[in-house]
Curated annotation (Swiss-Prot):
Binding site for S-adenosyl-L-methionine: L76, G108, F127, S128, K129, M130, T131, F132
Organism: Staphylococcus aureus (strain MSSA476)
Function: Specifically methylates the pseudouridine at position 1915 (m3Psi1915) in 23S rRNA.
Entry EC no(s): 2.1.1.177
Protein name: Ribosomal RNA large subunit methyltransferase H
């Protein structure tokens, strides 16, 4: 079992890095977890739609280059399906039962994900209709993955 969080951009703030490191440590007994960062494109404000699409395409190419053919890709999208913590645990457990063992969660850049990445996705997941900073979403995602493993094992973390 392997979980990868594939994200556009780098974590800069120490407090986000510390939170991620804590959950990586907690996930150790359950799964192998990798965090892969791909370079984000410089995206000045007031870009045209064409420029936004070009940024998304370049970031999308970098994302797709990091995904193996056998990986199950779960993209984080505002239009994705909203699940409870139990629902995420059930979704992962069901896919593991079907023999899937390499999961890649994709967090796009500030302009979203390119259509090629969306087409490669096996499942579109949404945490909210709201928009959150990408750094924060990494922490929320890794915490929910940890919570899902605790739920799947029937352990006490989840309340």
């Amino acid at each position: 079992m392997k979980i990868t969080i594939l994200a556009v951009g780098k974590l800069k703030e120490k407090y986000w890095k510390q939170a991620i490191a804590e959950y990586e440590k907690r996930l150790g007994p359950y799964t192998k977890i990798d965090i892969i960062e791909v370079t984000d494109e410089k995206a000045p404000e007031n870009m045209s739609d064409k420029e936004i699409e070009q940024v998304k395409e370049k970031e999308g190419q970098r994302i797709l280059a990091k995904i193996k053919p056998q990986s199950t890709v779960i993209t984080l999208e505002i239009q994705g399906k909203m699940l409870s913590s139990e629902g995420l645990a059930q979704e992962l457990n069901q896919r593991m039962t079907q023999g899937q063992s390499d999961f890649v969660f994709v967090i796009g850049g500030s302009n979203g994900l390119h259509k090629d990445v969306l087409q490669r996705s096996n499942y579109a997941l949404s945490f909210s209709k709201m928009t959150f900073p990408h750094q924060m979403m990494r922490v929320v995602l890794i915490e929910q993955v940890y919570r899902a493993f605790k739920i799947m094992r029937g352990e006490a973390y989840h309340k």
